[in-house]
Amino acid sequence: GFVRQGNAEDLMIGIHERPPIGTSFADQQSDSSLDDGSDVPYPFTSCDDLIALCEKHHMSIADIVWANETAMQSAVQVRSELDNVWRVMRRCVQHGCHTSQTVLPGGLNAPRRAPKMYARLASNSDVLARDKKRADAVLESSDAAWVDLFALAVSEENAGGGRIVTAPTNGAAGIIPAVLHYYWHFVDHANEEGVITFLLTAGAVGYLFKRNASISGAEVGCQGEVGTACSMAAAGLCAVMGGTPQ
């Protein structure tokens, strides 16, 4: 099973049991309805399958995933859940950058660094609170530093018991929000539809890792879960920047 962090607004969307030692989730799921794809119009179990579907039907990865998801639940529900993922990610980054908590819990007396880093990068101007993207020239001062900040803010929220999106795990939870915030704040044509495309595309990559290998740090180490998150984020960013499935 898993342990939930104690937030009153948390929504439990599923429970899985830890596979026996020496096996993976892929071993356990070989006969599951999720994997056989019987209930979706475009089933895929490998990257080759996914690319072939995109080429055959002239669809993007996000289109494929959207069609599959809306075959199992309404389009309104799917969109609502994706919007909520983005909403929680934004609130997490904002809270991580603005919190008054100075030391993380746990007894190690580890200081929170994101608030001071944010104040320094933003020249004490509350850039994240502004709806208009690229609203301040300070955003252009250091793209990489801002991405680092976004990831750090989420990681510190996780360590502090805040509300996060497991993307795909708690340990790697900062990577996808960081890259998605980069898109939102640094790309001129960024919009809500792009966010949805990003999340759908990233989800397809995460599914392939989950099905064929593992996203668990306990199974494949921290770099396994971080590598998965990086691949998901890279795919999402590629999709919204005009890249193709290939």
Model-assigned labels for residue ranges:
Residues 1-134:
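C-terminal regulatory domains involved in ligand/effector binding and gene-expression control
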Residues 46, 190-191, 244:
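Intrinsic-disorder/low-complexity, polar/charged segments
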Residues 47, 54, 92, 97, ...:
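Generic recognition of cysteine residues
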Residues 72-221:
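Accessory "access/gating" subregions that flank catalytic or transport cores
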Residues 210-246:
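C-terminal catalytic subdomain
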